[in-house]
């Protein structure tokens, strides 16, 4: 299965903890989600995407995900997101892939744009520590 990642899963360490394994660098194919904007979720450090006819959200397509991977991703994303097919642009072509789209009744966007590099500087360390604890009931990826 192929997914478009646009938020914290763009960080390879986060993806490794969630999936229980590190994906090879070539698993991440640059792509963008036209007709949307990426905002920080209200009261949170992670993003949501919202419709915006002038917007285009950068991200990656990750393919070759197993049913178990999708299960882990679904647990990670939680009830605030639903899995939907959306059209993304990659290498100049539009293609349909799977995206975790926010459920508006559960996650509200702030006015603040979300930036991966800023999130990594400000929030990543504590976020990954919490994530490792949350996923400690099953084997997680370790660099050791």
Language-model region placement:
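Glycine-aromatic micro-motifs
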Residues: 1-144
């Amino acid at each position: 299965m192929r997914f478009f990642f646009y938020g914290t899963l763009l960080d390879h360490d986060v993806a490794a903890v969630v999936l229980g394994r590190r994906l090879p660098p070539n698993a991440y194919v640059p792509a963008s989600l036209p007709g949307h904007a990426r905002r920080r979720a209200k009261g949170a450090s992670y993003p949501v995407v919202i419709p915006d006819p002038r917007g285009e959200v950068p991200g990656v397509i990750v393919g070759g995900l197993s049913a178990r991977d999708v299960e882990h991703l679904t647990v990670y994303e939680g009830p605030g997101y639903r899995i939907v097919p959306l059209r993304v642009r990659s290498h100049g072509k539009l293609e349909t892939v799977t995206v975790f789209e926010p459920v508006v009744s559960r996650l509200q966007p702030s006015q603040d744009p979300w930036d991966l590099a800023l999130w990594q500087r400000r929030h990543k360390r504590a976020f990954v520590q919490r994530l490792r604890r949350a996923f400690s009931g099953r084997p997680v990826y370790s660099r050791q």
